[in-house]
Each structure stands twice: as C-alpha cells, then as structure tokens.
Amino acid sequence: MALDIKLLDIIACPVCKGKLHYNKAVHELVCRFDKLAYPLEEGIPVLLENRARPLSSDELSS
C-alpha cells in the first residue's frame, strides 16, 4: 500500500518536528536533520523514534 502524499503536509518528525521526505524506493519517511528514516507499514507511517533507523552518510548525500 502506498503512502498518501497529502500526509506529508501535516506530519512531522517526532524528534525535531521538522519536515519529512518520502523515499519511494525504500518506502520510508526521512528526516535529514536528525538523520533518521521512519518505516511505513501497509502505507501507514510508523513515527516512533525507537523504530527509526539511522541514515548513513551515503544515504544523506543522495
């Protein structure tokens, strides 16, 4: 199930409250400021800090 792009206008990073970006290739919401990627489960964002994975420097540069 795909993410409803309209959600990106109303949701924010739970850590810094900043804007999230959708990485369609891996179905994750990315916070570049905190260097975290939040998973999507069946199209639903899981915005829990303990479920986020840290982004590598390679991922941040792309």
From Swiss-Prot:
Gene Ontology CC terms, in alphabetical order: cytosol
Highest taxon in the source lineage: Bacteria
Pfam families documented for this protein: Trm112p
Family indicated by similarity: Belongs to the UPF0434 family.
PANTHER family linked to this entry: PROTEIN PREY, MITOCHONDRIAL, ZGC:162634
Name of the protein this chain belongs to: UPF0434 protein AHA_2776
Organism classification: Bacteria, Pseudomonadati, Pseudomonadota, Gammaproteobacteria, Aeromonadales
